[in-house]
From Swiss-Prot:
Modified residues (ADP-ribosylarginine): 97
One GO BP: nitrogen fixation
Top-level enzyme category: oxidoreductase
Keyword field contains Lipoprotein: no
Necessary cofactors: [4Fe-4S] cluster
Binding positions (ATP): 8-15
Binding-site residues for [4Fe-4S] cluster, renumbered to this chain: 94, 131
Protein name, entry field: Nitrogenase iron protein
Length: 274
């Protein structure tokens, strides 16, 4: 079972990219579980046809210790297994702590057991690695390979670099490695070349360039992944390609994060700062 975590700055399209990629893997016949690690609890909506599923933390709050696995895992597109860790009530408690509680409970209830015959577990993790709780999939060896969703925008690249610092910190202890950058295009000038160069400097690869297409939003409005909504659309093939590249990937590295000056000079070199 491959344990994958998807990171990236808030609003970059992690949940969309994760779900569309998982749909591609499921279409290939892979058995996948998606664990949403975001208090917004939107990491599985498209796989479940728009169903806002009850989160692990909400279920725990209401049921106490009497939680069964079927209370917190739903079957989605092509038998993907979907669960959302959820978060505390706004203004109360620590969302990172909630992820730790949720993943531990999933383990106790046997969500990862061999009977489920899982090929992949995907963790869709909130924003930047800003606190220890959100770094938990990296830190505790829950995830073994990380993909960072980014774009040619400065803050997305800055966040990607910060996430690399987190991976570097825990690489020895947790055995986690960076599998590559996924460029979720924002149509920035020289975007593909810039992210390829960023990847090269960090010591990794740009595993796929996902072109911007409003069809992704149209599929989302219809509460589906692109592959589910219109399997013949060109954008569906982009996510199939990304799924295939992840499935075949053999490049796993300990990243070499850039100094801020290096990052800024990269932005200047490719014209974004002009």
């Amino acid at each position: 079972m491959r344990k994958v975590a998807i990171y990236g700055k808030g609003g970059i399209g992690k949940s969309t990219t994760t779900q569309n990629t998982v749909a591609g893997l499921a279409e290939m016949g892979k058995k996948v579980m998606v664990v949403g690690c975001d208090p917004k609890a939107d990491s599985t909506r498209l796989l479940l046809g728009g169903l806002q599923q009850k989160t692990v933390l909400d279920t725990l709050r209401e049921e106490g210790e009497e939680v069964e696995l079927e209370d917190i895992i739903k079957e989605g597109y092509r038998n993907t297994r979907c669960t959302e860790s959820g978060g505390p009530e706004p203004g109360v408690g620590c969302a990172g702590r909630g992820i730790i509680t949720s993943v531990n409970l999933l383990e106790q209830l046997g969500a990862y057991d061999e009977e489920w015959d899982l090929d992949y577990v995907f963790y869709d993790v909130l924003g930047d690695v800003v606190c220890g709780g959100f770094a938990m999939p990296i830190r505790d060896g829950k995830a073994e390979e990380i993909y960072i969703v980014c774009s040619g925008e400065m803050m997305a690249m800055y966040a990607a670099n910060n996430i690399c610092k987190g991976i570097l910190k825990y690489a020895d202890a947790g055995g986690v490695r960076l599998g590559g950058l996924i460029c979720n295009s924002r149509k920035v000038d020289n975007e593909r070349e810039m992210i390829e160069e960023l990847a090269r400097k960090i010591g990794t690869q740009m595993i796929h360039f996902v072109p911007r297409d409003n069809f992704v939003q149209r599929a989302e409005i219809n509460r589906k992944t692109v592959i589910d909504y219109d399997p013949t659309h060109g954008q569906a093939d982009e996510y199939r390609a990304l799924a295939r590249k992840i499935d075949e990937n053999e490049m796993f590295v300990i990243p070499k994060p850039l100094e801020i000056e290096e990052l800024e000079s990269l932005l200047i070199e490719f014209g974004i700062a002009n």
